[in-house]
Amino acid sequence: MPKSPFLLEAQARGLIFQCTDLDALDEAMLAGPITAYVGFDPTADSLHVGNALTIMALRLLQKHGHRPIALMGGGTAKIGDPSFRDEARSLITNETIAHNIAGIEKSLRQFITFSDEDPSSGAILANNADWLDKLSYINLLQDVGVHFSVSRMLGFDSVRQRLEREQGLTFLEFNYSILQSYDFRELNRRHGAVLQMGGSDQWGNIVSGIDLTRRTDGKQIFGLTTPLVTTSSGAKMGKSAKGATWVRPEKLPVFEYWQFWRNTEDADVGRFLKFFTDLPVEECERLGALEGSEINEAKKILATEATAICHGRGAAEEAAETARRVFEQGSAQAALPEIDLPANLIAEGLPAFRVFQEAGLAASGGEARRLIRGGGGRVNDVVVSDENQTFTLDDLRDGVLKVSYGKKKHILLRPV
């Protein structure tokens, strides 16, 4: 059992999947503040909920007095991380990379404090293009390449799976692990970083950086990975029919972000409260153990607390109040027409186009499909983009589905 506050709380929250030497890292953290980093791939101009666990790990690290580094992959983005991908990433331009880095920095500022706000312990924003763009290929081979075993690299799960599926791996992508390892050593030299954190898919790359630094500099550094987050039904975290659940309000309205967390499956509530909120672990466990209608209150707390971290307390409470007005017996809902729906229809799973038919917002299946394709259809205030997306009793909010078309047509479907 670790003794340092960060590792103690990280373990209690379930944030630790693997760690290279937990006892030695614990000793280092007990001795004083350390510097740790997480890398971010600038392939989009916002982070999303799929990145949230490593962001929360950085946030927790900073809470306990350690300094985070947010490393932008401005150099490695020109190659692309092949980890567990079916095909090579499309190469992106320098202009797009710069735009995306600015957006990711804005995303991170919603969660952690940077050095321009707190010089003593604020996060450092680094960009690996600052050193990778200046590398000489011959020098890289002499300095770094000599320490890498091709047979070992072929054994990385991310590489092996691509090769086993006979999808190929370019030499460009194969070099990604070498450059990420170089990053760890460089951040150790420049900023004293002794810990790299990342998702479980980054384990091989992290260990390679530790090994390189030990071989060339004789230093002990550490790696820690967070678990892969899936829902209890096996769905990948942060993905929906609409795509990624973005953290920037310019990419996704705050209310929809709140709704994402409100729609958490019952079995995931306790786990997600520990992962994605600052509530005490004991409170997370108490809320997660609630059953029946009480679990819905826990989901609202999860939604409000997770949204408050990302968008601020005021915006989170405004989203919660909007939801209360719409879904609970308040003035907004009382004014909406209600249609009874045979419960057996939705219990078996009702396709989205049928939902709009049953609500009377479309006269036929074809019209309903066209309505959805046009982007004007919403269920529970979330845009429906897949006409065959199914809705079940689990999607009810206080006993109803709110079905909307445009800004003024709203119907409540109540299974009976």
From Swiss-Prot:
Short sequence motif 'HIGH' region: positions: 42-51
GO molecular function: ATP binding; RNA binding; tyrosine-tRNA ligase activity
UniProt short sequence motif 'KMSKS' region, positions renumbered to this chain: 236-240
GO cellular component, one term: cytosol
Binding site for L-tyrosine: 37, 176, 180
Subcellular locations according to the entry: Cytoplasm
Domain (S4 RNA-binding): residue spans on this chain: 350-416
CDD domains recorded: TyrRS_core (cd00805)
Cited function: Catalyzes the attachment of tyrosine to tRNA(Tyr) in a two-step reaction: tyrosine is first activated by ATP to form Tyr-AMP and then transferred to the acceptor end of tRNA(Tyr).
UniProt name for this protein: Tyrosine--tRNA ligase
Source organism per UniProt: Gluconobacter oxydans (strain 621H) (Gluconobacter suboxydans)
Biological classification of the source: Bacteria, Pseudomonadati, Pseudomonadota, Alphaproteobacteria, Acetobacterales
